[in-house]
Each structure stands twice: as C-alpha cells, then as structure tokens.
Amino acid sequence: MYSQRFGTVQREVKGPTPKVVIVRSKPPKGQGAEHHLERIRRSHQKHNAILASIKSSERDRLKAEWDQHNDCKILDSLVRARIKDAVQGFIINIEERRNKLRELLALEENEYFTEMQLKKETIEEKKDRMREKTKLLKEKNEKERQDFVAEKLDQQFRERCEELRVELLSIHQKKVCEERKAQIAFNEELSRQKLVEEQMFSKLWEEDRLAKEKREAQEARRQKELMENTRLGLNAQITSIKAQRQATQLLKEEEARLVESNNAQIKHENEQDMLKKQKAKQETRTILQKALQERIEHIQQEYRDEQDLNMKLVQRALQDLQEEADKKKQKREDMIREQKIYHKYLAQRREEEKAQEKEFDRILEEDKAKKLAEKDKELRLEKEARRQLVDEVMCTRKLQVQEKLQREAKEQEERAMEQKHINESLKELNCEEKENFARRQRLAQEYRKQLQMQIAYQQQSQEAEKEEKRREFEAGVAANKMCLDKVQEVLSTHQVLPQNIHPMRKACPSKLPP
C-alpha cells in the first residue's frame, strides 16, 4: 500500500559522510482484502451516484421538453386565435367598407339622376357637350400616344442604338486591354515578390543551419569537456580509493606486528608464570582475535561499499554519456527530418502555385469565352428585338391607318346622315304652313349657320391635323438631334456596371488603373 501511494522507495539512505549509511525500516503490511473490499465499495457508491445523477438529468430533460412542448402548443393556439380574430375583424371591416361604398354609389347615382332631371339639356347643348368631350378624348389619346412613342423611342435608343453600342464596345475593349496590361504587371510583381521571399527564406534557412552547426559544435565541446572532467574525477576517486586501500593494508600490517610484539612480550613475561596466567592469556588472546576479526570484517565491508559506489558512479557516468550521444543523434535526425519537410513544403508550394496559375488562366479563358458568348447572344437578341420593334411599329402604323380610314368613313357617314337630316328638315319646312314661313325661315337660317359652323369646325380640324403632322415631323427631327446629343452624353458619362467589373479589379482595386 505504501509503495502504491509513494512509488518504489530505496531503503538505504546516505549519511553526511561517505561511510555512513542509514537503512530505512520496512513499511507495515496492510490488510489487502479489507482495502480491496473498501475500494470495491467506493467504486459501487460512485457508480450508483453516477446512475442517480444520469436519471435525475434525464428526468429534468424530459420535464423541460414536456414544458417546452406545452408552451409551444399554448403559443400555437394563442397565435391561431389571434389570427382568427384578426381575419374576422378584417372581413367585418371589408364588409362595412363595401356597404358604405354601395351607399355612396347609390347616393351619387341618385344625385346624378336628380341633376340630369333638373338640368334637362337641349339637343344642341348635348351635341356641343358631346363634341367638347370628343375633342378632349382625342387630345388625351393623342397625348398618350405621343408619350408612348417617346418612351419607346427612348428605350429603343438606349437599348438598340448601333452607334452607342459600337462606342461602348470600343471603350470596353480599351478598358479590357488596359486591365490585362495591369494584370500582367501585377502578376510580374507577384512573381518578383515570391522570388524575393524565396531568397529571404533560403537566407534565413542558411543562417539557421549555420547557427545550428555552431550550437552543435559548442555542445560537442561542452560534452567533451564534461567527459574529460568526469574522467579526471573518476581517476581522482580511483586514486583516493587506492590510497585508502594502501592505508588500510598498512594499518592491518601494523596491527599484526603490534599483536605479534604483544604476544611475544606476553610470552616472554609470562614464561615462568605460564601455569598461573594461562587462563588469563587464553582469554586475552580470544578477545584480541575477536577484535581483530571484527576490525577485518569492518574494513572489508567498507571496501565492498566503496567498490559498489564506484561501480554506480561509473555506470551513471556511462549512462549520462550514452544519453548525451542519443540526444545528439536525435537532434541530427530531427534536423534532417526538418530539412526534408521544408524541401517537401517548398516543392508542394511550387506545385500549388503552378496549379493556381493554371486555374487562373483557365478562369480567364472561360470568362473570355463566356463574355464572347454573351456578346453574341446580345447581338442576336438585339437583332431579334430590332426586328420585333419594326414589326410592332409597322403593325401600329397599320392600325393607325385603319383607324384613320374608319374615322374618315364614320365622318362621311355622319355627313351623309346630317345631309339626310337637312333634306328631311327642308321637306318638313316646305310642308309647313305659310303662316309659319317666317319662323321656318329663321330656323332654316339658324340651322344653316350651324352647318356652316360645323363645316368651319371640320376645316379647322383638318388644318389642325396637318399642323399636328408638321409638328410630328419637326418633333422627329428634334428627337434625332436629341438622340445624337444623348449618345454623346451617355458616352461622356458612361460607367461600367458593378456586374461587369473584371475579377482582378474586384480583387485588387488599388493596384489597377482607374
């Protein structure tokens, strides 16, 4: 249990001096089964707590989903009720407005009938009013026709004017040429910048490589110095160990000589008293031999400890040297791998740039082909629209001629009817009584005056039509002049639409000419 908590612990602990070693006591043995059961019980408690937490969270989630579902249903029903109320209110409002409108129309109709009954126009006033209304309608129709023709002419001028199209095409071609030149210059500038960047990266890579070589040389010198210092330290330790060993040997020899001299002296002193002191000599010899044996064992133990320490130091030094060599080899392999990755990255970058150039050229070619196709399509559409416009103009002109012929035939029919009415009136006048001759003569004179006024009105209408045709001709001349002026104005104020801007101008607007 102790080793599981704190890891493997060495029992031997070095003291303040080289020959002092403290042995750590063994940790007490724990109750393995009880700890295992306790661990299983804790794991079951954690598992049950996790299951309870999962069930609680699932219950909370279901409750939240149910509350959200109920809220959505309540909101849906509330919205449906409000929409239904709004629709009903709208329908009721529409019905009320319809009823008010019906009442208003009925009221206006009643007022109109009342006014007509109160007014009781005569036939002559009604004819004058109808003539005035006809004149106003003719003027209104003529004005609408002129506005429509002007609008169509302006639209035809803006969309299908050949001179304007040629001028705009020339301007567009010039701009395309200028933008292509600017694009070529921009690509050359990009290539130059890429070349400068590659040179800079090569220079930085060379500097980095030289710095790495310098660091490796310094590291090698440092490792060499460290190995030399380690070797000198090991030699010094071996020398000190040999000196200690020689001192120990000399001490053993000195002790042996001392023991021998003591034994000889004791033997010489106790030769006569051997029988009396034999027991004491035997005890003294035993004590001395035991002390000598303990001293020899202690010296041998110290020698073995020193040998083990020296072997550990040598192994540690060799291990450090091996680790340094492995690190150096790993660094060299990392540097070679980084060089390979960098070269691979440069090759991939060149391939990507070539692919981008090819893709860019392909996009330009597709854009050019698309623009040519669009221009051809526009030309075809313009020709078709021009033909349709000519057909429409011819149809309109034909309809105008037919309307004019119908109008003239109707006028002739009206004149014939009027002449017929005149003849009938004259016959009626001849059939009337003599006493009403003066009155009939006066009425005939008034009617003759009205006919003269109608003839004068018709002559004025014909002169007005001639004047209108002359004005139309002058308006056509002025429109032609305005067309030419408008062409110059459009050319002077022409701007490229946003959808026709070149992609390079959108990408780099500050590096291209305006």
Curated annotation (Swiss-Prot):
Q: Name the UniProt key words of this record, in alphabetical order.
A: Cell projection, Ciliopathy, Cilium, Cilium biogenesis/degradation, Coiled coil, Cytoplasm, Cytoskeleton, Developmental protein, Differentiation, Disease variant, Flagellum, Heterotaxy, Spermatogenesis
Signal peptide positions on this chain: none
Cystines in this chain = none
Concerning InterPro entries, the annotation shows:
CFAP53/TCHP, TPH_dom
Question: What does the protein in this record do?
Answer: Microtubule inner protein (MIP) part of the dynein-decorated doublet microtubules (DMTs) in cilia axoneme, which is required for motile cilia beating. Regulates motility patterns of both 9+0 and 9+2 motile cilia through differential localization and recruitment of axonemal dynein components. Required for centriolar satellite integrity and non-motile cilium assembly. Required for motile cilium formation. Through its role in the beating of primary cilia, involved in the establishment of organ laterality during embryogenesis.
The linked condition is: Heterotaxy, visceral, 6, autosomal: A form of visceral heterotaxy, a complex disorder due to disruption of the normal left-right asymmetry of the thoracoabdominal organs. Visceral heterotaxy or situs ambiguus results in randomization of the placement of visceral organs, including the heart, lungs, liver, spleen, and stomach. The organs are oriented randomly with respect to the left-right axis and with respect to one another. It can be associated with a variety of congenital defects including cardiac malformations.
Protein's recorded name: Cilia- and flagella-associated protein 53
Organism of origin is Homo sapiens
Q: What is the lineage of its organism?
A: Eukaryota, Metazoa, Chordata, Craniata, Vertebrata
